[in-house]
């Protein structure tokens, strides 16, 4: 099975530099809608057996925009297992403010998750956020699907995908986080071993610019 992961489009809170997490949400920016429309055109000839999205509005809307351009319309199923990392007290806060108060924790969150202490913020642990998402993905093993599109969130998908690729916790953020409206593709035959086909790809935007 080939798994296409897309991070939702850029939102107002992304632009303002705020943590969104699993409780916070904000509308997609007009530029994000344009990017997702371009992504939809890029994927228009890809036949997905199913589209799964987080049930948070920014992810659902992103999935809908992509789907609108598809030559092979299919059902969008929104599920809580794909929600963003639950960040507790951080949700809605300005990232710059938290960086000033908890510099070491913010460095850990961005670069070495083994040093991130979720209890400081009443947030989900690394294990919990990745386990709920990976468990959902591995349950797709029993489906007779060839290609699936999964629309989710930056922090959760970055950690979950890297975990599926076999990286230990200190290395989950080594290559940085996923960009808004980026594509990451994994392929698997047994849902235990995953091969990375492409990571955090936004080349489709360059193709649009060239055209």
Positions of predicted regions on the chain:
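Extreme N-terminal starter segment of soluble prokaryotic enzymes
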Residues: 1-4
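Active-site metal-binding loops of divalent metal-dependent hydrolases
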Residues: 9, 154, 202
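Active-site-proximal alpha-helix that buttresses catalytic centers in soluble enzyme cores
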Residues: 12-74
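Short beta-strand scaffold positions
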Residues: 53, 131, 151-152
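Acidic, low-complexity terminal tails and accessory targeting/binding regions
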Residues: 68, 72, 87-100, 146, ...
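Phosphate-handling substructures
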Residues: 69-132, 195-198, 210-211
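GST superfamily/GST-like fold recognition
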Residues: 154-158, 195
């Amino acid at each position: 099975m080939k798994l296409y992961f897309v991070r939702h489009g850029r939102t107002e809170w992304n632009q303002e530099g705020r943590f969104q997490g699993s409780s916070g949400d904000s509308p997609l920016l007009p530029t994000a809608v344009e990017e997702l429309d371009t992504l939809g055109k890029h994927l228009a000839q890809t036949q997905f057996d199913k589209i799964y999205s987080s049930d948070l509005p920014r992810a659902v809307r992103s999935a809908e925009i992509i789907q609108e351009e598809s030559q092979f319309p299919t059902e969008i199923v929104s599920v809580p297992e794909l929600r963003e990392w639950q960040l507790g007290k951080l949700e809605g806060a300005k990232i710059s403010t938290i960086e000033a108060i908890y510099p070491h924790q913010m460095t850990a969150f961005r670069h070495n998750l083994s040093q991130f202490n979720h209890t400081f913020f009443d947030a989900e642990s690394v294990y919990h956020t990745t386990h709920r998402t990976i468990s959902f993905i591995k349950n797709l093993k029993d489906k007779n699907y060839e290609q699936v599109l999964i629309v989710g969130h930056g922090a959760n998908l970055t950690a979950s995908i890297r975990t599926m690729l076999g990286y230990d916790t200190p290395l989950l953020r080594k290559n940085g986080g996923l960009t808004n409206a980026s594509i990451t593709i994994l392929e698997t035959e047994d849902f235990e071993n995953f091969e990375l086909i492409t990571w955090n790809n936004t080349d489709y935007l360059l193709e649009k610019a060239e055209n």
